[in-house]
Each structure stands twice: as structure tokens, then as C-alpha cells.
């Protein structure tokens, strides 16, 4: 019995030591801005929505880079060039009578930017994800596919991978829920 207690104590000490050495990195400066094309949709989506998705991208990148095994950048500047919601935003629901939150569409996002390293070198970042199959949208939240694009950016940065060109299909949905849509 005594031997079991000694072994258990040793494992607990080793476990705590391993956890202490796996502390996340600090100090990565992540800046996210909204591109001019997406700013044009601010009146339709709502400015709160754009603030929320930029915060989502920032948090995803900070988390991935902090836990990265690759040499992390010291600064990441990102631009959300385009984002299309899967479901109506709060502003769209408030503006259109009869519009349901159950309405669903094809969403996604396009992100570009630059990662700067401690030695001054810079690497461009270009990533996009747009869903093309409506059957994949069951249970999707408002910005589900945009979040998938943000997760791809974060994953690539965490692994030190930088797609030089946009890949995959472009936007297939407009993100404009309700009829008629007034573009003014």
C-alpha cells in the first residue's frame, strides 16, 4: 500500500511539472480590422456583428499562436475582407417582419493579413472558407462558416503555415436575408 502511495505521489509531481512547462506563450499582438467591402455591409449586418466577428478572429488567433509549437510571430495584422452569415443577424431580424432565425444560407469568410516575426521578417496570410453545400448547414449558428474560416487562419498560424493564395470556392451566398433587400 505504501508503495502505491509513493508511486501516486511521484506521478502527481511529474504531472504538475509537465503542466507547468506547457504554459502558453504571451505577448503576441493581434490586430483585426474590417475591410472596405465588408464595411459596405455594416448597415445590413449591424456594426455589433462586425465587432463580434473581429473579436472572434482575434481570440482564435491569440489562442492558437499562444499554444503553437512553431516559432510564433510577435505581431499579426489581419483584415476580414468578406464575411457572410449563415443565419440572419440581429439587425436583419429586427428590420424584416416575418423573418425567422431558422432561415439558413451559405456563409463563410475571407481573411488576409501579415505576420511579423521577431527578426523583422514578414509572411503574408490569405485564407478563405465558404460553404457550398446547404445540407452541411444543419445546426449552424449565425457566423458558423465564418468561424470555420477563422479557425483555419488560427490553425495555420499555430502551425507556422501560410497559404500564399486564396484557395477553395468563393462566396456562394449573399448573406442578405429578407425580401426585398434595400441596398441603400
Segments (PLM) and residue ranges:
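A structural "domain/chain start" motif
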Residues: 2, 8, 17-56, 86, ...
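Repetitive helical segments and hydrophobic/amphipathic motifs
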Residues: 11-12
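Short loop/turn segments at connectors of secondary-structure elements within structured domains
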Residues: 26, 70-72, 123
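Short secondary-structure boundary motifs at beta->alpha junctions and helix caps
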Residues: 38-49, 121-160
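Short structured motifs
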Residues: 47, 62, 95-99
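N-terminal, post-signal-peptide region of Sec/Tat-exported proteins
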Residues: 49-82
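Surface-exposed short loop/turn segments
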Residues: 71-73, 77-119, 133-137
Amino acid at each position: 500500500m505504501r508503495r502505491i502511495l509513493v508511486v501516486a505521489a511521484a506521478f502527481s509531481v511529474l504531472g504538475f511539472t509537465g503542466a507547468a512547462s506547457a504554459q502558453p506563450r504571451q505577448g503576441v499582438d493581434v490586430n483585426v480590422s474590417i475591410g472596405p467591402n465588408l464595411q459596405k455591409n455594416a448597415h445590413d449586418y449591424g456594426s455589433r456583428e462586425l465587432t463580434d466577428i473581429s473579436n472572434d478572429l482575434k481570440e482564435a488567433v491569440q489562442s492558437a499562436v499562444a499554444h503553437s509549437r512553431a516559432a510564433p510571430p510577435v505581431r499579426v495584422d489581419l483584415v476580414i475582407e468578406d464575411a457572410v452569415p449563415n443565419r440572419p443577424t440581429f439587425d436583419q431580424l429586427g428590420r424584416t417582419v416575418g423573418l425567422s432565425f431558422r432561415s439558413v444560407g451559405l456563409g463563410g469568410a475571407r481573411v488576409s493579413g501579415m505576420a511579423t516575426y521577431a527578426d523583422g521578417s514578414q509572411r503574408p496570410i490569405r485564407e478563405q472558407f465558404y460553404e457550398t453545400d446547404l445540407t452541411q448547414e444543419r445546426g449552424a449558428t449565425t457566423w458558423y462558416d465564418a468561424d470555420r474560416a477563422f479557425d483555419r487562419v488560427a490553425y495555420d498560424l499555430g502551425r507556422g503555415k501560410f497559404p500564399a493564395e486564396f484557395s477553395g470556392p468563393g462566396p456562394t451566398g449573399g448573406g442578405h436575408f429578407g425580401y426585398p433587400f434595400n441596398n441603400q
